[in-house]
Amino acid sequence: MTKFKDHFSGHAVEYAKFRPHYPDKLFEYLALISPRHELAWDCATGNGQAAVGLARHFDSVIATDASAQQIASAELNDRISYRVAPAEASGIDSASVDLILVGQALHWFDIDRFFTEAKRVLKENGALAISSYNVLEIAPEIDAIIWEFYRETTGPFWPPERELVETDYKSIRFPFAELSPTRFEMRERWNLHQLAGYLRTWSATQKFIGARGFDPVDSVAEELWTVWKNPEEVREIKWPLHLRVGVSKRR
């Protein structure tokens, strides 16, 4: 059995505070491709952000995460049942789920075992949506600094699974009847302090701090300050979303 790769429990509160939010239109789209709206499963829910979005369109949402600390930081909602469970062994009833969403987490799973679990819990024609996003976009002079921080400073601390995100999960065998998804992007309006908080949520940043004993975001924030000018100024930040969407066919 593959060991759970826990990259976020140690900073679950910061993760909940500084992660970007999925657009409402994404959840509208997921409801549209779902055959019914009785039950959705938000797998690897983290702080429950996507589960709350799904709860606006589904009668019930089961939101699981292998990290108890992440579940403890999740946003409560009457329609959401939070559970500590690995993606590969959810404990959800067979053929009970209309839609599964995995947001920015598939690369941490035992992927073949997860797909087996997804097929087990999905209803006939139930949908699986896998989303990912890479490095943020602000402006060319800022993006160049962020990319250097991503590649050079924290690069050695990214686990090999990160390559799957960089290729938008395109290299993964997807054993479902695949659809051509609509394009979406996440947007936030942050000042420099909020951006620095987000960079600290990167698993590679946390591993850097653990290995080197100091926070590399302090240095990159100073460099960003030279082009940001006023650190209190709010700028628009975007993350293009990449989706792979498929339908379960039992026959």
Regions found by a protein language model. Name each.
Residues 1-13:
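N-terminal, positively charged/glycine-rich alpha-helical extensions of SAM-dependent methyltransferases
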Residues 88-99:
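A short acidic, Gly/Pro-enriched loop at the edge of an enzyme's catalytic core
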Residues 167-251:
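Conserved Class I S-adenosyl-L-methionine
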Residues 109-117:
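A short, conserved alpha-helix within the catalytic core of class I
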Residues 102-103, 111:
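A short beta-strand submotif of the Rossmann-like class I SAM-dependent methyltransferase core
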Residues 17-38:
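Conserved alpha-helix/loop element of class I SAM-dependent methyltransferases that forms part
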Residues 119, 123-189:
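Conserved catalytic/acceptor-binding region of the Class I
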Residues 41, 47-90:
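Class I SAM-dependent methyltransferase SAM/SAH-binding core
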